[in-house]
Amino acid sequence: MLVPLYDTVHDRLDVGRNTRLLALDCGSGLALLLAAARGAAVTGYDQDPDRLRLAADRMAAPQRLGTLPRGALTTDTEACLRTGAPAPADLRAGGYGVVTALDPATPAEVLRPALSAVAASARPGSAVVLAGWGPPERCSAARVLKVAARLAEPRGQAVPPPRLSGRDDLEDLARGAGLRPDGSGRVSCPFGYQDQASAVRGLLSTGLFDPAVAATDQQQVEKEIAEALHPYRRPDGTVRMENVFRYLIARV
């Protein structure tokens, strides 16, 4: 559902055969796959081995990751997947012209150290792209996600809020890491599901409702999500939530 965001960023930075792209918190690799399809040489880092296994499948890796020891997986599409975060030596040697941090669920405090390392060690002039939710009033999904915070509250479970929805939050994060803002934009990314059950399942898969499930139970959380989705159900039974995401281009 974030494909419009990925495509817009790739178009704006002319990602293609001459691009070496590094993705922070690459997740299950959809943005990497789209960049590789344009001919870019891509490298992705993530803390979650299970997500990297999904990314390897998407990149048509010739071998399985197995237990995924720290290190690289090189695929036939010039893709390299690594656990953790890039070390300064990797950033200096990689020659990356584009660095992305496009997962809006990554908290700013988690992302900040990696961005600081990029600012200190990546190639001067490299583009660094950050993304986050747009204004809450423009994001239907943000209203539904409030259910997670409310249900998790009784037991004090930590619920990461939608990241970087303030007007200058992306710029503040970039400047705080030593990067220079150099342009921004907004992209419409509607969340669409074939029915209510698919919408509930899809939202639960984000992990943002895990603390709510721990504080209550799965059935209660599913019930509350379904109720919150009611305003977004269409006459044909599908569910559609209009959302806006914002991206910032900064320079090393």
Please place each PLM-identified region on the residue numbering.
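Conserved alpha-helix/loop element of class I SAM-dependent methyltransferases that forms part
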Residues: 1-20, 30-34
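Short, well-ordered alpha-helices that flank and scaffold nucleotide-derived cofactor binding pockets
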Residues: 11, 33, 37, 57, ...
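A generic alpha-to-beta junction signature in SAM-dependent methyltransferases
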Residues: 13-15, 36, 115, 121-122, ...
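Class I SAM-dependent methyltransferase SAM/SAH-binding core
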Residues: 20-89
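Conserved Class I S-adenosyl-L-methionine
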Residues: 28-30, 165, 171-252
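A short SAM/SAH-binding and catalytic strip from SAM-dependent methyltransferases
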Residues: 96-112, 134
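Conserved catalytic/acceptor-binding region of the Class I
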Residues: 112-113, 119, 125-194, 210
